[in-house]
Curated annotation (Swiss-Prot):
Family annotation (Pfam families): Aegyptin_C
Keyword Signal assigned: yes
Protein name: Aegyptin-like protein
Feature: compositional bias, Gly residues: 141-151
Signal peptide limits: 1-19
Biological role stated in the UniProt entry: Anticoagulant protein that modulates blood feeding of female mosquitoes on vertebrate hosts.
Keywords assigned by UniProt, alphabetized: Allergen, Blood coagulation cascade inhibiting toxin, Disulfide bond, Hemostasis impairing toxin, IgE-binding protein, Secreted, Signal, Toxin
Family: Belongs to the aegyptin family.
Gene Ontology BP annotations: suppression of blood coagulation in another organism
Domain of life: Eukaryota
GO MF entry, a single one: IgE binding
Localization terms from the record: Secreted
Organism per entry: Aedes albopictus (Asian tiger mosquito)
Acidic residues composition bias: residue spans: 24-45, 53-126
Length: 271
């Protein structure tokens, strides 16, 4: 039993010794690392610091470069703005000069237009005065032809003959519309047109004036005869149209001799 008790005691002592806490000095010695491990750690830390420092230096250099680039860009933009402003200013001056030139041209054009209009107005006034003077001369010639009858003016002769025909061959006083239309057609085709054609080239009315003295009375006689015949026809219970056709055919045969006499007279005296 004693040996067992001693062995038990030994184990108890060992357990007590093992269960006791370690002193701080011993723990520090245990925790101390070997020089190689420490140098390795320091080397790694130095490399990390070096990398950090290099990155920081690189960042500072990049920031400085960016600032310098920004300054140059700003200077370039300012310079470009100044150049652009100068160009704009020059452009404005140029535009102003062109504008002045255009205004000057416009004023010149207006002046030329005004002068042209004045010249045209003067020309038109001159033409108007010439026409008036010409018209006055023609009027004088016509007046002279009417008074003396010796002017060689075919136009004046034509107007005088037409006036005589209109005066001596009127049928406006005939009441029947059918008879009036029929006799008017006869006078137009048998008297007016042939006489006008006969005197178209004659210049002196005084030479042929005597050819128309009896024309008015001769035509009036034919018209009166046809009116009487028309009334007699209506008493026979014929229609107004039928009676007018009878007068139309009869008057044509009576007017032709009158026209032939006038044309013969004009032809003989007008030469």
């Amino acid at each position: 039993m004693k040996p067992l008790a001693k062995l038990f005691m030994v184990f108890c002592l060992i357990g007590i010794v093992l269960s006791r806490p370690m002193p701080e000095g011993e723990e520090g010695e245990g925790e101390e690392e070997s020089p190689d491990d420490a140098s390795g750690d320091e080397t790694e830390g130095g490399e990390e610091k070096t990398d950090d420092g290099a990155s920081e230096d690189g960042g500072e250099e990049e920031s400085k470069a960016d600032e310098e680039d920004g300054g140059e860009n700003a200077d370039g933009e300012d310079a470009g703005g100044d150049d652009a402003g100068g160009e704009n200013a020059d452009g404005e001056n140029t535009d102003g000069e062109n504008t002045d030139g255009e205004n000057t041209d416009g004023e010149n054009a207006d002046g030329e237009d005004a002068e042209g209009s004045k010249d045209e107005g003067d020309d038109s006034e001159g033409d108007g005065s010439k026409e008036e003077s010409t018209g006055g001369d023609e009027g004088g010639d016509n007046a002279g032809g009417g008074e003396g009858g010796g002017e060689n003016d075919p136009v004046n002769t034509y107007h005088k003959v037409v006036a005589i025909l209109d005066k001596d061959t009127k049928v406006d006083n005939i009441q029947s519309e059918y008879l009036r239309s029929a006799l008017n057609n006869d006078l137009q085709s048998e008297v007016r047109n042939p006489v006008v054609e006969a005197i178209s080239r004659l210049g002196s009315f005084s030479k042929i004036e005597g050819c128309f003295k009896s024309m008015g009375s001769d035509v009036k006689k034919v018209i009166d005869e046809e009116q009487k015949a028309f009334k007699d026809c209506m008493t026979k219970k014929k229609s107004e149209y039928e009676c007018s056709e009878d007068s139309f055919a009869s008057a044509k045969g009576k007017l032709s001799p009158i026209t032939s006499k006038i044309k013969s007279c004009v032809s003989s005296k007008g030469q």
